[in-house]
Amino acid sequence: MRLWGGRFAGGPAEALARLSISVQFDWRLAPYDLLASKSHARVLHRAGLLDADELAAMLAALDELSDAVAQGRFRPTVEDEDVHTALERGLLERLGTLGGKLRAGRSRNDQVATDLRLYLRDSAREVAARLTELSHALVVLAEQHVDTPAPGMTHLQHAQPISFGHQLLAHVQAFVRDIDRLRDWDVRASVSALGAGALAGSSLPLDPQGVAAELGFDRAFANSLDAVSDRDFAAEFLFVAALIGVHLSRLGEEIVLWTTREFGWVELDDAFATGSSIMPQKKNPDVAELARGKSGRLIGDLTGFLATLKGLPLAYDRDLQEDKEPVFDAVDTLLLVLPALTGTVATMRVRRERLVAAAPDGFALATDVAEYLVRRGVPFRQAHEAVGQFVSWCVAHDVDLDEVSDDDLGMINPLLTPDVREVLSVRGALEARSAPGGTAPDRVREQIAALRPVLDRDQAWAVG
């Protein structure tokens, strides 16, 4: 079935038909198209274009068609060009010529723009719900390891001791920002395009604002041409999805490192690890690696989508058929990765003894010595130089900072007196970072207390 044809003497060539068909991927928009159709039927009734009996019959047929779609009893055929064509066929099969009245005042251009917004607004909430679940899992693990010291790293080199809980919460902060972006995105996406027609609006007495309210949008379009041309909402969603992917990749990379024999900080549950087809001893962090790998796919969805939009003249162009697959792929990818990564985090076992042993490695307390000298009135540049000499001497003699004798301290630099030993403690180093947002255990507990209501708020938005 086609929604056009009177202008043409014959049907499209088979090659064109194969190229044009999109129902194999846009069928997932069917529930949203049917929802919008019910609102459009009601506005046609208010406009005097459907009488009360016709409206009742129309709504009953749309309800029955919705049930048939949901139960798989109605499916598109190879003759259906797209989701709109298939559903109109289903309506005509149920209502005959009355079903054709629903087309009045409506174009596939404003239909698809509205359907895609409805789909993405639901999908954004589903992604946010899965993100809050991952964040909750990280918070629970962080709470268990508020007092567990770990090597804090820069350039993947030992830098300063931190609370392992503090490191886990850093990932939560990124995910909270991602959810904030989804909520902020939703404000701009909450615009209905129904009533815009093909591009110029309609000469029929439609009610775009009323339809928008019925469909849960905050407002109707301000410019009919922009309404059918605009795909900013999809591009912006794809950016947020790509950034979520980047954040998942960074967490995945750390889990990969933590599970290596060289680090040995974390043991994965068997349910979230795989083996090797040839090496019997292997236990591979596939979930974390796939989270890392899928981020490239999400970035590709965004860049491919933007390339499609570049240079398009206003109103609908057939290029926009290509807008849906990257959007659908991004949603599917996130909803595939997030539960698996949540399960990985929720079940992995932290090897606390390995973290405690590694925390002071690599002269990680050197900064504490420098800051101790600063508190005694030594200019930081001089303190930095003295402690650099201290570390250099320890490297040359293969000893740690706390293994240097009093005599050797003075020989290395006169500023290094025996009382510097007071700060050569991992526990003291953690406690000393007590400024707001720091890694001191009390501050980490404050972070957890502050995050819980934020995540509860985000979960409420996601399911509301």
Swiss-Prot record:
Pathway(s) this gene product operates in, as recorded in its UniProt entry: Amino-acid biosynthesis; L-arginine biosynthesis; L-arginine from L-ornithine and carbamoyl phosphate: step 3/3
Class of this enzyme: lyase
Keyword field contains Transport: no
A Gene Ontology cellular-component term: cytosol
Domain of life: Bacteria
Pfam families linked to this entry: ASL_C2, Lyase_1
Keywords: Amino-acid biosynthesis, Arginine biosynthesis, Cytoplasm, Lyase
Protein's GO biological process: arginine biosynthetic process via ornithine; L-arginine biosynthetic process
One Gene Ontology MF term: argininosuccinate lyase activity
Reactions mediated catalytically: 2-(N(omega)-L-arginino)succinate = fumarate + L-arginine
Compartment list: Cytoplasm
EC numbers: 4.3.2.1
Family designation: Belongs to the lyase 1 family. Argininosuccinate lyase subfamily.
HAMAP family: Arg_succ_lyase (MF_00006)
Protein name: Argininosuccinate lyase
